[in-house]
């Protein structure tokens, strides 16, 4: 089975003219030191930051403004990634480098292909599209963050709330309940949803057009035979000419323009509302928040509130204001068109009325016909008939797409067979029960923990130290289930300081034993912990990175490492290039 493994991490701070590099071996790695404030957590956070995740750094580290390079492998293939702020430079051969201006979009797609991560999430907004989520959603089950994860699994990184309701599909994908085929079908469902929405918008426009026709030409109860109309037409055809056709065209054009104006006015209301909301966001960030972090009161996500972030808000506001201005200009153009069409329509109708006065008469059956009414009726019926046909067509399309969506959702449900679901459930409950027992966390009530989505039910029973061990049992179970499910290429398991809540000596020994004996043989493990005698069995098998009082960055070595990163940056080609090989 293929695995992703970290090889080398390089940190460079031009601010302090200091740098360092760290190498990892394929199986066990230990990051340790004599005390708790030497940078163990910052080191592992930078691994994930380099790959586009957003771990929570303290202000001291942020002030260093580091560039971070990471070398990693998937099976036998080497990859290099360099992150500077939010820009990613990437290579799959160590020679040709390609620069991505942002983490979302192309880079996320490239990375997801490398690790075979097929989960997709709908974007927020009125017109959601199915997107490849950033690498953070892939790495979530592989990183136990010291501050965020021991009491809240699936919460190792910031900014995860960029997608609504992401947890269920992501957790289920990692643990095998949703397959890559599920998301392939989901893409088709979203395509049909977009077609349904477009059809609905067309129906709304058609209804508006019909209302406009009825406004200009009220409904008539006039009934006239073809023979009667031919008699009248023959008498007046030289003078009536193309007036009926002209009125029909003018009326159709006017209804189209009025309908478009109506919908643009709705869009204008939305755009104005967006400007106001963005202005309120900026005022709040400036007037009420004193630091560079802002925690969401609803989901707990910590958002960036730095000067750069505030500048981004102002940029968003400018874009929204530009959109308001553009829509207003479009409406003004439509108003001009309406002002031009209305006199033309009135002129045509006035000419028809003149002909009506000239030829108003009764036929031999004493039936009296008003030519204006006849021409109006035929024009109105023609326009309404055309739009009604389109309306019926769009409604049929909407129903067809809804039916296809139902078929696809049924196909999705059938992907997870009863036996497969039972097998996944048995694997999960059996393993977490075994691990909780091995970790001596028997005070934790597992009776309601039947599924990987039940992680919150781990907490609340047993003591705080037992809760920490139960959290590790859960994370280890998920890690093993990822291998069992085989939906993706697994990443290394990174555990930041498992000695939470002052674990008793024998329980800490059990934690180390579980990590050594119950992680898959082909997996890579990176463990952070204070140096002590109980780490002995792990140290015997591990590559040890021992941090000293100089912490992560040193003055010596800066020139060499800085030059290495500069050469990569200078050689990188701007933008995504299809030359990147994703098939190896």
Please annotate each region the language model reported:
Residues 171, 175, 179-286, 307-423:
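Extended, charged coiled-coil helical stalks used as long, distance-spanning scaffolds
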Residues 86-183, 187-190:
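Extended, charged alpha-helical "arm/stalk" segments used for dimerization and assembly
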Residues 282-316, 450, 454-459:
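Short coil/loop "hinge" linkers that interrupt or connect long alpha-helical coiled-coils or helical hairpins
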Residues 508-584:
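C-terminal lobe/lid and adjacent interdomain/linker elements of RecA-like ASCE P-loop ATPase modules
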Residues 467-489:
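GG-anchored amphipathic helix commonly corresponding to the ABC/SMC/Rad50 NBD signature/C-loop
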Residues 102-143, 246-294:
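Alpha-helical coiled-coil
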Residues 34-39, 448, 452-475, 498-506:
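Conserved ABC ATPase signature
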Residues 1-79, 584:
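Extreme N-terminal "head/tail" segments of very large remodeling/mechanoenzyme assemblies
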């Amino acid at each position: 089975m293929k695995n992703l493994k970290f090889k080398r991490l390089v940190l460079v701070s031009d601010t302090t003219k200091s740098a360092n590099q760290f190498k990892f071996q394929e199986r066990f790695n230990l990051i340790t030191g004599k005390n708790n404030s030497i940078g163990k957590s910052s080191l592992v956070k930078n691994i994930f930051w380099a790959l586009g995740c957003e771990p929570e750094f303290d202000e001291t580290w942020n002030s260093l403004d580091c560039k971070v390079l990471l070398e990693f492998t998937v099976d036998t293939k080497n990859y290099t990634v360099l992150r500077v702020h939010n820009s990613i430079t990437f290579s799959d051969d160590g020679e040709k480098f390609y620069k991505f201006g942002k983490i979302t979009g192309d880079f996320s797609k490239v990375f997801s292909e490398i690790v075979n991560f097929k989960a997709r999430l709908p974007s927020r907004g009125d017109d959601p599209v199915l997107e490849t989520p950033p690498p953070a959603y892939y790495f979530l089950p592989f990183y136990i963050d010291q501050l965020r994860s021991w009491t809240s699994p699936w919460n190792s990184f910031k900014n995860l709330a960029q997608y609504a309701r992401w947890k269920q599909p992501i957790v289920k994908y990692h643990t095998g309940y949703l397959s890559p085929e599920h998301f392939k079908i989901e893409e088709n469902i979203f395509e049909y949803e977009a077609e349904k929405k477009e059809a609905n918008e067309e129906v709304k426009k058609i209804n508006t057009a019909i209302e406009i026709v009825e406004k200009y030409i009220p409904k008539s109860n006039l009934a006239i035979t073809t023979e009667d109309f031919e008699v009248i037409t023959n008498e007046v055809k030289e003078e009536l000419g193309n007036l009926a056709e002209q009125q029909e065209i003018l009326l159709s054009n006017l209804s189209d323009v009025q309908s478009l104006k109506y919908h643009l006015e709705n869009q204008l209301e939305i755009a104005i509302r967006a400007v106001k909301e963005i202005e309120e966001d900026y005022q709040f960030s400036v007037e009420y928040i004193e630091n560079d972090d802002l925690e969401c009161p609803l989901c707990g996500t910590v958002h960036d509130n730095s000067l750069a972030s505030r500048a981004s808000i102002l940029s968003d506001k400018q874009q929204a204001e530009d959109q308001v201005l553009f829509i207003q200009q479009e409406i003004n153009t439509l108003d001009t068109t309406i002002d031009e069409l209305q006199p033309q329509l009135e002129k045509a109708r006035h000419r028809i009325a003149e002909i009506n006065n000239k030829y108003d008469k009764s036929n031999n059956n004493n039936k009296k016909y008003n030519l204006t009414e006849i021409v109006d009726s035929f024009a109105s019926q023609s326009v309404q008939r055309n739009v009604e046909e389109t309306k019926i067509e769009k409604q049929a399309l909407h129903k067809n797409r809804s039916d296809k969506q139902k078929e696809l959702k049924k196909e999705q449900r059938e992907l997870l067979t009863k036996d497969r679901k039972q097998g996944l459930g048995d694997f999960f409950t059996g393993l977490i029960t075994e691990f909780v027992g091995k970790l001596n966390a028997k005070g934790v009530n597992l009776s309601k923990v039947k599924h990987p989505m039940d992680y919150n039910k781990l907490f609340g029973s047993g003591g705080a130290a037992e809760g920490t061990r139960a959290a590790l049992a859960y994370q280890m179970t998920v890690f093993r289930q990822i291998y069992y499910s085989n939906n993706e290429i697994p990443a290394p398991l990174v555990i930041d300081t498992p000695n939470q809540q002052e674990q008793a000596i024998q329980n800490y020994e059990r934690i180390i034993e579980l990590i050594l004996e119950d992680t898959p043989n082909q997996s890579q493990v990176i463990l952070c912990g204070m140096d002590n005698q109980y780490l002995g069995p792990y140290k015997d098998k591990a590559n040890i990175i021992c941090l000293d009082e100089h912490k992560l960055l040193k003055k010596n070595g800066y020139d060499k490492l800085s030059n290495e990163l500069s050469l990569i940056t200078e050689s990188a080609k701007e933008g995504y290039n299809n030359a990147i090989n994703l098939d190896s």
